């Protein structure tokens, strides 16, 4: 019948704050550190599902915002879920669309209620709030669901960064309530996202507030958006020191081989 996903989280080895771990999902086991190939719109570009498996990938990433636009949540749900739709029988993590607040910032409008996006394909307007973003991911059958967050651009003022972080925290509570009401906790898990820009103080505040919400896993968001590598490495190391120790960690947006290896090893003594 599948696993209760993060009750099976296990630390295999540690060195400083660097960790090797494994966890089970209803679609199989994931060993970390792990790289997630990006399958934004239910496909990893230029590769078939079999070719992806042949690379050794054990989990892939989808984007619920893009999938909700095309082909649509209902079609994917009616097809039997995202795994069936893309012919992938291993774990899938879906991002909520919060990063598009940053990447599509010229065409969207952000309020405390949610984000109004313009579709990159036809220019139509679409409003997404934390509840809908969470429901979309539940309905398409993602193994790991990400909270809806406000990822703000690098260089924003401290006041703007703090406002985006506070909004992220409020949205995280709404995502959690929605998941508790409609999610399948035996088969899916919800991760919170740490924000706070490049401010150590704000990062520590975000860590404290979101840790208290007791998500099944945590992501470090808002990095790899233009800051220096030394700043990114410093903030990842800071977050690693304070994230709940018995839970998985997801570093969002980082994918170069150099950064992957550096950030895995930077936490070692």
Residue ranges: model-predicted function:
Residues 125, 156-167, 198-205, 227-231, ...:
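Alpha-helix N-cap and loop-to-helix initiation/capping positions
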Residues 78, 207, 232-237:
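Charged helix-capping and loop-helix junction motifs
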Residues 139-140, 167-190, 195-225:
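Alpha/beta enzyme core
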Residues 56-57, 141-142, 210-218, 244-246, ...:
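Glycine-enriched alpha-helix->loop->beta-strand junction motifs that scaffold or abut catalytic
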Residues 193-197, 248-258:
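Glycine-rich beta-to-alpha transition loops that act as phosphate-gripper elements at the mouths
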Residues 5-184:
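Non-catalytic, usually N-terminal nucleic-acid engagement modules in DNA/RNA processing proteins
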Residues 262-269:
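Residue-level detector of conserved catalytic or cofactor/ligand-binding positions
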Residues 68, 149-157, 199, 216-227, ...:
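Conserved radical SAM core fold
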């Amino acid at each position: 019948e599948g696993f209760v996903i993060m009750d099976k989280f296990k630390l295999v080895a540690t060195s400083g704050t660097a960790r090797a771990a494994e966890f089970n999902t209803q679609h199989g086991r994931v060993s970390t550190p792990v790289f997630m190939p990006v399958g934004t719109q239910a496909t990893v570009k230029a590769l078939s599902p079999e070719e992806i498996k042949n690379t050794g990938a054990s989990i892939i990433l989808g984007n619920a915002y893009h999938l909700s636009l095309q082909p649509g949540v209902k079609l994917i749900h009616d097809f039997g879920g995202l795994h069936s739709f893309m012919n992938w029988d291993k774990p899938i993590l879906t991002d909520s669309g919060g990063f598009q607040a940053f990447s599509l910032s010229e065409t969207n409008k952000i309020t405390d209620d949610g984000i109004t996006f313009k579709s990159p394909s036809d220019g139509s307007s679409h409003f997404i709030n934390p509840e809908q973003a969470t429901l979309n991911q539940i309905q398409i059958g993602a193994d790991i669901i990400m909270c809806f967050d406000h990822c703000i651009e690098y260089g924003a003022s401290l006041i703007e960064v703090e406002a985006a972080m506070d909004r992220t925290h409020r949205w995280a509570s709404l995502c959690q309530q929605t998941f508790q009401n409609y999610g399948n906790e035996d088969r899916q898990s919800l991760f919170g996202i740490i924000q706070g820009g490049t401010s150590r103080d704000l990062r520590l505040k975000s860590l404290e507030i979101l840790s208290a919400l007791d998500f099944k896993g945590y992501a470090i968001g808002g990095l790899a958006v233009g800051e220096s590598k030394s700043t990114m490495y410093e903030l990842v190391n800071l977050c690693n020191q304070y994230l709940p120790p018995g839970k998985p960690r997801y570093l969002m947006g980082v994918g170069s081989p150099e950064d992957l290896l550096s950030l895995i090893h930077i936490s070692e003594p």
